[in-house]
């Protein structure tokens, strides 16, 4: 796995405390224990079993004190991660221990990001706060007066709005209009400072990225304020890649995070498709079957999937290649309908218990209920 990730020991400079294989083991330990980075380092210093698992020895007199080393390793692996090559490597290792390689079970789930529930007010206020803070910093560095605006008045109104238990729609709309107008003014004031003193100011790459996101937020909020629908909606300034995913569940109608279409082979799950934008998993059944056949080199004979996969295109594909499914029958019954009914029942029962149960196990015991990574690549690695 370390070779597949492109990790190697340094030939020059100070020797790494963690070897390439130890870095992979540390990430596995992180997911298994559910510890924070600081807690993981503390347990690693004092637990000989964790050290043996990672293949390192930490003397009590020289413990690891910098817990950010876990984050550095996570970013290093995330920048080199290739999910397909990793899964092919793991599948080749697990294949001798697996049975029923001809059965493909598939379903989609959402692994939520650890973020506050997004609202228009929160998004606008985060944009205003960041922009005003940087305008003040620019003026302080240049030694010029701050431009006049209504930031303090809007801040007081927003604080009063947040403290209210019952919020009238008319008051909320008035405050939203004021925040949109103020955001437009702050952007124009910032652009004015840049046009006059841009050569004296230094901007980072993160600054430009955050500024472009705020401009998109302003455009989207103006569109929604005028009653128009917005596609590809931004729900977080920090995690600008996250999009709302409508799930239609009783407890959570909308979720925010990575939507993943999984296949399961004898209890082992593999990622077929991952996206932070909503997608229709029903059209991906053919890709799931092809992926399993590529990983296991065994022809798929049975498919267990949810009703969303039971469209006409998938039914024709499975009929063409002689694949039995768990889909509810359409049309007249065949001669061997009792046997097919038993097979459909077994496939549906297996999918509902093992596949959907694995989602709960991952989220409860492997730190996937709320992913706390801070950027897109590390969130995929998590």
Placement of each model-derived feature along the sequence:
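Basic, short loop/linker segments at the boundary and entry of helix-turn-helix/winged-helix-like folds
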Residues: 1-25, 338
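Acidic, metal-coordinating catalytic cores used for nucleic-acid/nucleotide bond scission
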Residues: 14-18, 48, 304-312, 332-333
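Alpha-helical support elements that line or immediately flank enzyme active sites
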Residues: 24-34
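Short, conserved catalytic/metal-binding motifs centered on acidic residues
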Residues: 26, 40, 64-70, 102-112, ...
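Basic, amphipathic alpha-helical segments enriched in Lys/Arg and hydrophobic/aromatic residues
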Residues: 206-207, 211, 221, 225, ...
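Flexible, glycine/threonine-enriched loop-and-boundary segments that flank and lead into catalytic domains
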Residues: 236-251
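Electropositive, glycine- and tryptophan-enriched low-complexity nucleic-acid-binding patches
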Residues: 249-295
């Amino acid at each position: 796995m370390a070779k597949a990730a492109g990790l190697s020991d340094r030939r020059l400079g100070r020797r790494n405390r963690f070897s390439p294989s130890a870095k992979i083991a540390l990430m596995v330990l992180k997911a298994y224990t559910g510890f924070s980075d600081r807690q993981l380092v503390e347990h690693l210093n004092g637990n000989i079993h964790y050290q043996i698992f990672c293949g390192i020895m930490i003397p009590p007199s020289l413990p690891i004190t910098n817990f950010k080393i876990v984050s550095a390793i996570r970013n290093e692996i995330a920048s080199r991660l290739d999910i397909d090559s990793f899964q092919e490597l793991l599948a080749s290792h697990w294949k001798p221990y697996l049975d029923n390689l001809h059965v493909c079970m598939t379903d989609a789930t959402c692994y939520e990001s650890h973020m506050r529930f997004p609202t228009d007010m929160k998004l606008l206020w985060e944009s205003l706060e960041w922009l005003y803070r940087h305008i003040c910093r620019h003026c302080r560095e240049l030694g010029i007066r701050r431009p006049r605006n209504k930031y303090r008045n809007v801040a007081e109104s927003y604080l009063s709005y947040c403290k209210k238990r019952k919020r009238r729609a008319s008051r909320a709309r008035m405050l939203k209009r004021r925040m949109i107008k103020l955001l437009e003014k702050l952007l124009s004031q910032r652009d004015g400072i840049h046009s006059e003193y841009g050569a004296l100011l230094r901007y980072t790459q993160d600054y430009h990225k955050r500024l472009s996101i705020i401009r998109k937020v302003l455009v989207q909020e103006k569109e929604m304020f005028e009653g128009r629908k917005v596609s590809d909606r931004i729900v977080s300034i920090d995690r600008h890649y996250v999009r709302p995913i409508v799930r239609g569940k009783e407890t959570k109608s909308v979720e925010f995070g990575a939507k993943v279409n999984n296949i399961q082979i004898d209890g082992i799950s593999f990622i077929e498709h991952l996206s932070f934008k909503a997608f229709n998993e029903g059209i991906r059944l053919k890709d799931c079957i092809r992926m399993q056949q590529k990983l296991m080199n065994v022809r798929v004979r049975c498919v267990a999937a949810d009703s969303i996969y039971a469209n006409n295109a998938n039914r024709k594909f499975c009929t063409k290649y002689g694949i039995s499914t768990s889909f509810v029958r359409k049309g007249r019954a065949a001669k061997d309908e009792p046997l097919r009914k038993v097979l459909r029942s077994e496939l549906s029962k297996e999918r509902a218990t093992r596949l959907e149960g694995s989602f709960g196990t991952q989220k409860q015991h492997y730190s996937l209920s709320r992913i706390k990574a801070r950027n897109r690549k590390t969130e995929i690695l998590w």
